[in-house]
Amino acid sequence: EQMNEPETRHPYYYKWLKKIASSATRKMHRQLFAYNKDVVRRDMTLTSSIFEPLPSKYAEYISTVSRSGFDIIQVEFYPLISLGYLLPEGVQTIFVHHELRYIRNENEMTFLDRVTDEERMLYRIGKDFEHSALQTYKHVIVLTEVDRQILIDFIGEENRIHVSPAVVPMTDACDKQVVPTGFRLTFVGSEGHYPNLDAVVWFCQKIAPCLRSQGFHFTFQVVGPWKSSYVRELQMSCPELELVGYVEDLHNFLNGSIVLVPIRIGSGMRMKILDAVSSKAPFVTTTKGVEGINFHHEEECLIADSALEFASAVIRLAGDQDLQVKLANQAVEQLQKLYSPQKMLDRRLAVYNQIL
């Protein structure tokens, strides 16, 4: 029956030693990943937050097209923020700020082992550039009221900063049933966006050990492209991690799981939360993850900010099917009430009408 086991003098002692060896190997890989790879510095946005010249032909094209008689010219995403310097004065210009860059830089710098003088310099230069570039636009749109208040403090001029959340397709959320689970955990997001990598690393290195120590058995399925050697090392320290890749129907895939949002970095709206709600899947998030979205602890979700608290929230939710159903249904109701596609479209149109 034990064809694969070698003959040993003390079989039970040998099995015990194998378990110790397996545990030690996982712990060794955790240490290698944590300390030999400076992942934060590799992927942080600090060095890409200062001005970088645009291709000359592209800049010339934008300059020409923008003078073609538009009523409103709208620019989105931080890599294009410098276009404001090219746009003509006689037109209403808008920058849609999906994520406040200096806030993200501040968040990422808190996870460095040591902040160098050069990094402090880059942070200040980037923050000054962001401030100046935003001043070149007549109006700024952010996705949450939290970001609006931050920008008011940052650049002033309250009347030109507007809130217009992202439009969230509701699909067939109302028709779905909540499918409770006792072990299946999911996360949505690509490795290329560093806040996602930080979230998965934090889960695997800090939260997962807390789950194991309490005897909780689980699978952790991560949706999106994850291919680097860092992630393969991470799988060795967290065997519960399953890299799913692309899924055809995200909402059907998430249904029947507990969605995790262990996000510690960034600003704006976390679309992964809205995907969870549209999937009728209950979710556990950090305060940062749900920031700016009008969901509350114990009402639409569970919120926890330390590894131990996050693990405890996961175990509690996995063990309470009624709570899963309650949170998922109440989150859908809140989403429909506050973030229905038509309401969001009307809100954006109201901003445009106000500007014109």
List each model region and its residues.
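Acidic donor-binding loop of glycosyltransferase active sites
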Residues: 138, 254-268, 279-282
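Donor nucleotide-sugar binding/catalytic pocket of nucleotide-sugar-dependent glycosyltransferases
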Residues: 102, 120-123, 131-173
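Short hydrophobic beta-strand element within catalytic cores of glycosyltransferases
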Residues: 272-276, 282-286
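Conserved nucleotide-sugar donor-binding subdomain of glycosyltransferases
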Residues: 13-72, 78-81, 113-136
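A charged, aromatic-enriched C-terminal amphipathic alpha-helix characteristic of glycosyltransferases
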Residues: 322-353
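Conserved catalytic-core segment of nucleotide-activated headgroup transferases in glycan assembly
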Residues: 163-255
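Conserved acidic donor-binding segment of nucleotide-sugar-dependent glycosyltransferases
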Residues: 297-308, 316-321
